[in-house]
């Protein structure tokens, strides 16, 4: 007698399971292991089987989904966002086009301080409603797991408000969220001459954040004009002692030594890395710290020097990709677009890109054992794409290729019959 399960996805043209015993690096990022003419079984929100057609023998499902020969992959993972914020900054785009520098925009009350002001003014519920809108977009683009940072408060009340909003967002919509405390995102004007005092104030929040379960990671912006390597080391060591995983906004502009620090402290990830040194790249490879690259930020800022993804991969660094969704330097929820930018500007292959937005991205936020792979026993987080093969997604840029998103075994996005794009 056939075993009853909830759902069978059949007639899959190409299946990427992304099965891996850990984050991929070097040549293993080329090993995609495509299964053609495939099938997936789901029950109670979990994968029962995934493999070649015929694996469904002995099972009977209440729901059959015919994938029509299309591409099927794990849900995408976005390991770096700033999606809880107030306001927006569209007025700054024309100023940038006219040649106004960021410092000039900042002097006029724009830049990050504008977002800090708007985030302070917003209520917790307003931040949640705005976050729900952005997460709905992310889900529609195939993202089923994401990281979200605070950092637009720079004071106790607003940072806690952001983190609380993020926690509630995780409870009110399908995308799984991992939260990072980033109170050390910038130096407030009132602490310009006393950054150490500001960092100490942020460190004082850690016990309450931990007690309330508001964040899993702590992050700091290690960059010229923000926090030094020495300040960052002290801050992150204390965060680690308080029980937080570590992340670093490292070497976005200058080769300050953020990559080396991330490796030294065995941070889970080092993010940005546009200015990372050769030594920093070597140390990241040796430490296992994952490089989270944000090419959408470089693209949107109109810069021409991108992170050296090709050298990182060749050196053995575990590389992932993220949107860096934020209102100032990367206002997009579209990880598919980032995949195209990674191909064109980071010179990553399609195979490397798929690892970077699934399995490696999941490990970059501590979700490697739960997200980013289609594997028996794991949550059934799956995307059916309006695409014939995996190479098509980074190739055909600027549109949404999602046909259906399945989260924990349930369809949460269906664009079938719609004018896709």
From Swiss-Prot:
Q: Look up the record and give one Gene Ontology term from the biological process aspect.
A: L-histidine catabolic process to glutamate and formate
According to the record, cofactor stoichiometry and binding are noted as: Binds 1 zinc or iron ion per subunit.
Q: What is the E.C. number? A: 3.5.2.7
Name the residues that bind Fe(3+): 80, 82, 249, 324
Task: Give the pathway.
Answer: Amino-acid degradation; L-histidine degradation into L-glutamate; N-formimidoyl-L-glutamate from L-histidine: step 3/3
Matches recorded under SUPFAM superfamilies: Composite domain of metallo-dependent hydrolases, Metallo-dependent hydrolases
Query: Does the entry feature the keyword Secreted, yes or no?
Result: no
Q: Which residues bind 4-imidazolone-5-propanoate?
A: 89, 152, 185, 252, 329
So which cofactors does this thing need? Zn(2+); Fe(3+)
Q: Does the keyword Metal-binding apply?
A: yes
Q: Which residues bind Zn(2+)?
A: 80, 82, 249, 324
Which GO terms label this protein's molecular function in UniProt?
imidazolonepropionase activity; iron ion binding; zinc ion binding
The UniProt catalytic activity note for this protein reads: 4-imidazolone-5-propanoate + H2O = N-formimidoyl-L-glutamate
Subcellular location per the Swiss-Prot or TrEMBL entry:
Cytoplasm
| Gene Ontology, cellular component aspect | cytoplasm
* UniProtKB keywords: Cytoplasm, Histidine metabolism, Hydrolase, Iron, Metal-binding, Zinc
Function per UniProt? Catalyzes the hydrolytic cleavage of the carbon-nitrogen bond in imidazolone-5-propanoate to yield N-formimidoyl-L-glutamate. It is the third step in the universal histidine degradation pathway.
Q: Which family does it belong to?
A: Belongs to the metallo-dependent hydrolases superfamily. HutI family.
Its recorded name reads Imidazolonepropionase
Organism, as annotated: Bacillus velezensis (strain DSM 23117 / BGSC 10A6 / LMG 26770 / FZB42)
